[in-house]
A protein has these predicted regions:
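Transition-metal
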Residues: 2-121, 260-266, 288-292, 299-304
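A gly/proline- and charged-residue-enriched helix-loop-helix capping module
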Residues: 108-142
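Non-heme Fe(II)/2-oxoglutarate
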Residues: 18, 53, 231-304
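A short beta-loop-beta micro-motif enriched in histidine and acidic residues
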Residues: 137, 150-160, 206-207
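Conserved short histidine dyad/triad with adjacent acidic residue
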Residues: 141-155, 174-178
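Catalytic micro-motifs at enzyme active sites that drive phosphoryl/nucleotidyl and oxygen chemistry
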Residues: 21-23, 88-92, 128-132, 147-153
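Short glycine/proline-enriched turns and hinge-like loops at secondary-structure junctions
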Residues: 154-157, 164, 174, 231-234
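Double-stranded beta-helix
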Residues: 164-220, 225-226
Length: 304
């Protein structure tokens, strides 16, 4: 896709011109698009600050951040965490090896929380949606990737703004509403915990959309749209802002359908009947969520 060349004006974090506003207003949470930003100018996201942030992440009692090494392929699985490296060491060697680092929930640090709040304010203005009211649990994450590394095909359950701040890479995105791309069974398995259920195959080629991103540009990816990423021959740093819908009955409906299908029945596809989706979400969907939350809390308390 053609690169965007217009700079972001003034002190705006995201470009506010007519072109950018139209993209956000028309495509947010419906279709991927390329946008412009100025996050690459922020000291918070430069390597010296990231090294300090990685150390803070390591020092936390409950470590949410993650790193791995290896050379995964598009249709493969993610890499493995090396036993002989710490998070900070992996970041220090990011240009030499084949590492992929995720600094998770960095908005828990005060300076990053302030940045996230500024992002939410501007993104609400651009989309025309009050993201603080219609969406919840906004998450600020940083991805740092070694040269030429692939991030395998997968999907995320949140709407995602991915802003490139260092290096360049290509993001390949697929339409989650196309049953050839993502079957109902794959969606049901994903929402009941099998995050690897959606599988890439050769016929999918290089995405229905592909975006070449560089510092100052980024990609919006709607919730559940499968994607994979190919880094170029440089270290890549990307800032991700994720949002979850406050009300999303389709999730509960998919969870209900998963077990309904196990009984040999053919459940109604979510989206065809909002009232049916709502009933499913309020009954079994809520029960599943409660059971999952209880299990997660217990495992965290027991350290397993």
């Amino acid at each position: 896709m053609a690169a965007i060349t217009h700079p972001v004006a003034g002190s705006e974090l995201f470009a506010q011109d007519t072109e950018n506003r139209k993209l956000f207003a028309e495509h947010f949470d419906h279709q991927p698009f390329l946008f412009r930003h100025a996050l690459n100018t922020m000291d918070l996201f430069q390597m010296p600050a990231l090294l300090k942030l990685a150390q803070k992440c390591m020092d936390k009692r409950q470590q949410k951040s993650h790193f791995e090494t290896g050379q995964p392929v598009v249709d493969g699985f993610f890499g493995n965490k090396p036993a002989d490296l710490t998070l900070v060491q992996a970041l220090e060697r990011i240009g030499e090896g084949s590492n992929w680092i995720i600094l998770k929930r960095i908005h828990e640090e005060p300076e990053n929380r302030e940045a996230l709040e500024a992002f939410i304010t501007e993104l609400s203005e651009l989309t025309g949606i009050d993201l603080r009211r219609k969406y919840h649990d906004p998450i600020l994450t940083i991805f740092i990737t070694s040269p030429n590394r692939v991030t395998p095909y997968h999907l995320d359950g949140e709407a995602n703004f991915l802003a490139q701040v260092q290096g360049s890479k290509t993001v390949y995105v697929y339409n989650a509403n196309d049953p050839y791309i993502l079957t109902e069974e794959e969606k049901e398995k994903y929402w009941t915990g099998n995050l690897l259920a959606p599988r890439w195959h050769e016929e999918l080629s290089n995405g229905q959309w592909h975006f070449d991103v560089k510092p100052g540009t980024g990609v919006f990816n709607p919730a559940t749209f499968p994607h994979w990423v190919k880094n170029t021959d440089n270290v890549s740093v990307s800032v991700s802002v994720n949002f979850k819908r406050v009300r999303n009955d389709s999730i509960g409906a998919y969870r209900t359908n998963y077990f309904t299908r196990k009984l040999g029945l053919r459940p109604t596809v979510p989206g065809k009947s909002p009232s049916v989706d709502r009933i499913k979400s309020l009954t079994f969907g809520n029960l599943y969520t409660g059971m999952h939350s209880t299990r997660k809390a217990l495992r965290s308390k027991l350290g397993v």
